[in-house]
């Protein structure tokens, strides 16, 4: 750490505190993520190892935050990242109204380029959300926080935890307890982020897992084996049933969005994971080639993080009161009225 001068605190993650720092010799500004080990015998946390491994696999992408160095420090170690001025959550929070169509296209295009690069290298991020999409001083968007990332097994045989992704961006298969999944979880999250940029607020702001499903059902309709055959194989499929609910046309949900935007959004927000449009295909969608064209990064808003104390983290969904099959349903809900329309009568 002697080669760096700490300039201030940026924030705090699951496994460490992040500082803004300056390299003493070169003057380069970086972000230092200090990871402390609770006990030396426990070794490096799995999330930190995953982040290092994932970033080493995809270090050549200009749309993924660059890991510059890893070095030991005290009873832990430090990750040195390129410094990014802000994040997409700050952009959305400070916007006085929904972003201009050209700005939405630009952010989404950069996000898709990063996701396409990750997926081409068999990396599934598993926690895409605006707070993990960092913005540089020049307006460049880069994907960060690979603590939940995994190297994807193309044969589909590996089992993973379903407790990944921040709830508002969590794919339906994860909400139904899927242990086998693929890049589709990232593509659903991209759709949620796109909808949030178009809407100015999250599309599916559930306060627990059941409310999250209800938010999705309210727009996309009740999933059925006819539309999504694999749903019957998911662990939590029969733990709660919902009344039949017809989908709401996306043009009613986002009346100001263009037909091209709604068409692309609809190809992300599909129940069957393998029917979701791939990131590489989405980049070729007509949405990006019709007026207005994507804005240049220099034309994008970059909210400055104020000096002094680090800004509070983007308010995400609370991770409490989750549904559990052995717990009375009314105890699992913060707002029981939200799901009442979906519960069968009798």
UniProtKB/Swiss-Prot annotation:
ATP binds at residues 10-18, 33. GO terms for biological process: cell division; embryonic brain development; embryonic camera-type eye development; embryonic skeletal system development; floor plate formation; negative regulation of smoothened signaling pathway; neural tube closure; positive regulation of cardiac muscle cell proliferation. SMART domains: S_TKc. It catalyses: L-seryl-[protein] + ATP = O-phospho-L-seryl-[protein] + ADP + H(+); L-threonyl-[protein] + ATP = O-phospho-L-threonyl-[protein] + ADP + H(+). GO terms for molecular function: ATP binding; cyclin-dependent protein serine/threonine kinase activity; protein serine kinase activity; protein serine/threonine kinase activity. It is found in: Nucleus; Cytoplasm; Cell projection, Cilium. The active site is at 127 (proton acceptor). It is an enzyme of class 2 (transferase). Keywords: ATP-binding, Cell cycle, Cell division, Cell projection, Cilium, Cytoplasm, Developmental protein, Kinase, Nucleotide-binding, Nucleus, Serine/threonine-protein kinase, Transferase. It comes from the Eukaryota. The keyword Cytoplasm applies. The keyword Oxidoreductase does not apply. Transmembrane segments: none annotated. GO terms for cellular component: cilium; Golgi apparatus; nucleoplasm. Its main location: nucleus. InterPro entries: CDK, CDK20-like_STKc, Kinase-like_dom_sf, Prot_kinase_dom, Protein_kinase_ATP_BS, Ser/Thr_kinase_AS. Pfam families: Pkinase. PANTHER family: CELL DIVISION PROTEIN KINASE, CYCLIN-DEPENDENT KINASE 20. Belongs to the protein kinase superfamily. CMGC Ser/Thr protein kinase family. CDC2/CDKX subfamily. Monomer. Interacts with MAK. Interacts with TBC1D32. This is Cyclin-dependent kinase 20.
